[in-house]
From Swiss-Prot:
SUPFAM superfamilies: Ribosomal protein S2. Keywords: Ribonucleoprotein, Ribosomal protein. Gene3D superfamilies: Glucose-6-phosphate isomerase like protein, domain 1 (3.40.50.10490), Helix hairpin bin (1.10.287.610). One of its GO terms (molecular function) is structural constituent of ribosome. Residues 228-285 are annotated as: Disordered. InterPro entries: Ribosomal_uS2, Ribosomal_uS2_bac/mit/plastid, Ribosomal_uS2_CS, Ribosomal_uS2_flav_dom_sf. Residues 258-285 have a biased composition (Low complexity). Belongs to the universal ribosomal protein uS2 family. GO terms for biological process: translation. It comes from Rhodococcus erythropolis (strain PR4 / NBRC 100887). GO terms for cellular component: cytosolic small ribosomal subunit. Pfam families: Ribosomal_S2 (PF00318). The keyword Ribonucleoprotein applies. This is Small ribosomal subunit protein uS2.
Length: 285
């Protein structure tokens, strides 16, 4: 079963890039055409790159690794938090703090402080303090939870990072590359593909596109967790096809072109399986 379908991506607007005047020439090889001044991303390539990224994430998690989900733009915040939480992975969906990876020792101390404040609140540690002291401690706890709450259980730097919008999250990309942590990311037409180890060409501005591709990565994590536990993959974790709006004629044409291509790839394999059976000698009576 395909990890994600062409129709799901078309429904989610994954194929829409930026305006033709706002692009990175290095992305030329991932662009199919332009329409009304907007670049159209080649979703056939996207499918191929999704498979590569999916396999990498699954194997990484299956061998005990963790994936940090990063997306602080409004379009990605909700899906980053919900999908990472669903599969038990750390995430950053508010503000990326400089040194979150390269200076993790200091960040880890702040995490311990957050847990200390939460324990104080739950066990009555705030009692006997002045209102001003309680207010200051509460504000400190709220601020720490807002910026670090998603990585509260991250005991060490992650094995890989999933990023929505490498331009906005340039600090996260730079820190990951400095530590040789593999970067998996959506590549919109204004991104630099040289900064990403496992690129997925697609729209990083549309809410539904970011959510779909984040769900794909989360599903790979879920499958890796199950493989680690020796369980079979949960089919329900795969992205579900949304109803979506009716496709435009040119989008339907893209979809119709994708089907024959998939059939053409499958045909040689089917013929190869059938050939040995046809060549087998007849059994004598």
């Amino acid at each position: 079963m395909a990890v994600v379908t062409m129709k799901q991506m078309l429904d989610s607007g994954t194929h829409f890039g930026h305006q033709t005047r706002r692009w990175n020439p290095k992305m030329k090889r991932f662009i199919l055409t332009d329409r009304n001044g907007i670049y159209i991303i080649d979703l056939q390539q996207t499918l191929t790159y999704i498979d590569k990224a999916y396999e990498f994430v699954k194997e990484t998690v299956a061998h005990g690794g963790t994936v940090l989900f990063v997306g602080t733009k409004k379009q990605a915040q909700e899906s980053i938090a919900s999908e990472a939480t669903r599969v038990g992975m750390p995430y950053v969906n508010q503000r990326w703090l400089g040194g979150m990876l390269t200076n993790f020792t200091t960040v880890h101390k702040r995490l311990l402080r957050l847990k200390e404040l939460e324990a104080m609140e739950q066990t009555g540690g705030f009692e006997g303090r002045t209102k001003k002291e309680i207010l200051m401690l509460t504000r400190e706890m709220t601020k720490l939870d807002r910026t670090l709450g998603g990585i509260r259980d991250m005991a060490k730097v992650p094995s890989a990072v999933w990023i929505v919008d490498t331009n906005k999250e340039h600090l996260a990309v730079a820190e990951a590359r400095k530590l040789n942590i593999p970067v998996i990311a959506i590549l919109d037409t204004n991104c630099d593909p040289d900064l990403v180890d496992y690129p997925i060409p697609g729209n990083d501005d549309a809410i539904r596109s970011a959510a779909l591709l984040t769900k794909v990565v989360a599903s790979a994590v879920a499958e890796g967790v199950q493989a680690r536990a020796g369980l079979s993959a949960d089919k329900d974790a795969k992205p579900e096809a949304g109803a979506g709006e009716p496709l435009a004629e040119w989008e339907q044409e893209l979809l119709s072109q994708a089907a024959p291509a998939a059939e053409a790839e499958a045909a040689p394999a089917a013929e190869a399986e059938a050939a040995p059976a046809a060549e087998a000698p007849a059994t004598e009576a």
